[in-house]
């Protein structure tokens, strides 16, 4: 039985203009529906493949601020989200999340600033700007992870060392075991290694489920580690 908060998304491409860049994204062509059957779902693919665009659309359609934060964050420093949010319908389950957060690396500074502005005596600021970038990014993620929550993360590994990624991995896994749901865009072979997750690959003109070992993130990392000198010789020799 699927007990996820977001059980899937249905696309209505008739609501998108024919000249929209969205219709030029190869992975989107022909896609009508995507199911979320696991507590943790990953989107992987090359830059520009549409994975962050879809995650953002899911977030906005579900009521989150396009730049990130909880549903209570209402601000806009640069309105750039796509119209895809108006062309999707989210299939929601019988459960309702008790907490939620949309975390994206590219607008982290703005969200951290707003967190300080929204702070009061009952909800003191975590002072993210007083920490290093990596420490503050991990702290923000940790402070907003709760059981039975819904979390949309866009490249959470961007500011994190490999060791910190392992810390985040453990917390995501633990939280998912307590009823939370995660949809995560990532290039990290570390995060992708979380057990019992679905991985959607955005490649070859489609969106499809794939195994961990079949992801480019894993294959390129493995190839580099196992054949570092040979690869460097090929890449760096004129």
Segments (PLM) and residue ranges:
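The conserved Walker
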Residues: 46-47
